[in-house]
């Protein structure tokens, strides 16, 4: 933010000034896709309160404040897409959605091994590896044949080669986005490297392959970064990073609304003698963010 020409302000709330400026990271999407998501949620009997970009939700669950400050690239590998969010100085700097994820790897296995999708998914989960060099040529897995047909033998090394080819393609596209952000510049360098999350991040040897292709330090992000107590195995699974992040995001919004409401009530008590002044103060207290949020809510409510 910038207040009266003073730049590099991260939190303007509580400061005085006559002019507020800001640089925003705008995320856009297809209207039809957003409305379809809203309709799907509403049809299940759940109220639709808002919408958040997937990697931003995942980032809340798996990234530490120190990583966001140092500079980090979050890669969320889902079923249909691979999402990228880059943070530097605790500010979101770049986002991107790559239209390939775990499902395309399953499809490659299905076509390459001439098997059905269910078998391809099981092979990927149980025997899949992003690094084919570790597999021996004589390692074979046998899967049941269809409708009384003979079992089919699949080479583990060949399976890993199929997975490796597609994963390298996805990583290279993501790394291109990281370079487009300007990672190679000293001021924009991502000191904390890469954090992998999402269901696809559980692929064996993926971390090592990402480090090899990008040359950046990499870790697997689990959604228990900000959770207290003994977390269950299910919640600690990177598959649920986005879900945990959405819950955290919603709780933070409710907390901010509660704080703002209490502050408004205190101001009304202090300025109770001047009704005109109170009216002006009330209008001013509705920030541009609140107005924008109201418009989004109205748009989502009209999804049907």
Can you say where each PLM-predicted feature lies in the sequence?
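Short acidic loop-to-helix transition motifs that present clustered carboxylates
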Residues: 53-60, 104, 225-228
């Amino acid at each position: 933010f910038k207040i009266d020409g003073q730049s590099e302000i991260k939190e303007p709330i509580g400061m005085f000034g006559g002019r507020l400026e800001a640089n925003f990271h705008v995320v856009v999407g297809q209207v039809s896709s957003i409305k379809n998501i809203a309709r799907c949620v509403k049809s299940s009997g759940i109220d639709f309160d808002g919408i958040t970009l997937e990697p931003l939700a995942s980032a809340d669950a798996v990234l530490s404040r120190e990583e966001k400050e140092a500079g980090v690239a979050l890669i969320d590998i889902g079923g249909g897409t691979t999402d990228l969010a880059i943070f530097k100085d605790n500010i979101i700097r770049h986002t991107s959605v790559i239209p390939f994820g775990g499902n395309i790897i399953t499809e490659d296995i299905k076509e390459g091994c001439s098997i059905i999708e269910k078998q391809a998914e099981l092979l990927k989960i149980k025997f899949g590896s992003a690094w084919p060099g570790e597999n021996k040529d004589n390692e074979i897995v046998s899967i049941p044949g269809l409708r009384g047909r003979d079992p089919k033998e699949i080479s583990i090394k060949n399976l890993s080669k199929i997975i490796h080819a597609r994963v390298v393609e996805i990583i290279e596209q993501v790394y291109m986005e990281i370079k487009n952000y300007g990672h190679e510049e000293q001021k924009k360098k991502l000191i904390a490297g890469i954090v992998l999350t999402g269901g696809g991040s559980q692929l064996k040897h993926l971390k090592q392959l990402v480090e090899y292709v990008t040359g950046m330090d990499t870790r697997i992000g689990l959604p228990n970064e900000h959770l207290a107590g003994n977390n269950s195995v299910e919640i600690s699974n990177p598959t649920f990073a986005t879900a945990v992040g959405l819950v955290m995001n919603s709780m933070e919004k409710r907390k901010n609304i509660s704080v703002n409401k209490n502050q408004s009530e205190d101001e009304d008590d202090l300025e109770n003698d001047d009704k005109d002044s109170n009216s002006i103060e009330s209008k001013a207290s509705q920030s541009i963010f609140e107005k924008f949020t109201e418009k989004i809510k109205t748009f989502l409510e009209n999804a049907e």
